[in-house]
Amino acid sequence: MKGSYKSRWVIVIVVVIAAIAAFWFWQGRNDSQSAAPGATKQAQQSPAGGRRGMRSGPLAPVQAATAVEQAVPRYLTGLGTITAANTVTVRSRVDGQLMALHFQEGQQVKAGDLLAEIDPSQFKVALAQAQGQLAKDKATLANARRDLARYQQLAKTNLVSRQELDAQQALVSETEGTIKADEASVASAQLQLDWSRITAPVDGRVGLKQVDVGNQISSGDTTGIVVITQTHPIDLVFTLPESDIATVVQAQKAGKPLVVEAWDRTNSKKLSEGTLLSLDNQIDATTGTIKVKARFNNQDDALFPNQFVNARMLVDTEQNAVVIPTAALQMGNEGHFVWVLNSENKVSKHLVTPGIQDSQKVVIRAGISAGDRVVTDGIDRLTEGAKVEVVEAQSTTTSEEKATSREYAKKGARS
């Protein structure tokens, strides 16, 4: 009994599910049949069906900018390192105990400033000894000269032999030689005493002290007492591709100093401006580059030895150049081109010859003129002769474009 009772319930459930499925199927079919005639009727009432209906839709939105005429600087760029104009390790030239340091670590010093003192006692004693010996020998020389004068008078009356006269003359000459040696000894002792006062050999900034007061130092110490780096002026050494050498040489022949700018590691902040000093005399065969040195006054201490910077050197300025945003320049099978807008906002493809460019602007040497409007965004939707809707059109007469132009003129571009 229980088995037949369960079977009946299973049959009832299956029948209910089948009924629900049939109802949903019938309802969906009626909806599709009622929608089809309305859609067909709407298509028939439309003035232009199919593709013509699509063409009557909204115009493709694009952004545009106006080509402008301006002076464009040309820069050569490279990576470089700041180096001190001079780097000197200050060492003692005499042996002795370090008595005093007369500088603060990091301060600027001038050539001749006193930096340190070595105990001068032994050098003063040596000087006094040399001076005493000199005085003694000078007295001996004076006495020998007086004797020589008497011998010369006596020789005239044959009271002194010629041999005695010659011997006295030789004694005078010998003593004169001794005097010269004594004078050299005095000068040497004086020099040793002077060297006990250690002075700055060049202008520059002193580093950290390498030895403390009280230590015994030697003239043979390679570490030295302190290192001085000359930072006013300071140099920048950077590299350029060998292909840029001719451009630099030609710019140098113009007779004007070439301006070199130092920018920070991120190339977003200008640190200082200097001038080209020289090119190296050979190309690095491994990298195909040449080293270039520029010099900066660095009075504001914006540059520091061993600092990494981006270098930019102005080599030329292209006057009356036609400039457009780089985003407008496209590349196709026929070469570079831009989409130009006419007065009716219809676009046409113009082949162009680009010149100097960077990430923001590009110089167009042929193909368009100043005042032409070019498409900068929405280019992928364009076809020849299509009419478009210009949205947020950019013009160089706006304050935003003027700011961009000033920034471009300041930074320039690399060819």
Curated annotation (Swiss-Prot):
Residues 399-415 have a biased composition (Basic and acidic residues). It is found in: Cell inner membrane. One of its GO terms (cellular component) is plasma membrane. Keywords: Cell inner membrane, Cell membrane, Membrane, Signal, Transport. GO terms for molecular function: efflux transmembrane transporter activity. Residues 1-21 form the signal peptide. The keyword Cell membrane applies. It is a peripheral membrane protein. Pfam families: HlyD_D23. Residues 31-60, 392-415 are annotated as: Disordered. The keyword Transport applies. Induction: The mdtABC operon is transcriptionally activated by BaeR. Residues 31-47 have a biased composition (Polar residues). The MdtABC tripartite complex confers resistance against novobiocin and deoxycholate. Part of a tripartite efflux system composed of MdtA, MdtB and MdtC. Belongs to the membrane fusion protein (MFP) (TC 8.A.1) family. HAMAP family: MdtA. This is Multidrug resistance protein MdtA. It comes from Escherichia coli O139:H28 (strain E24377A / ETEC). The gene is mdtA.
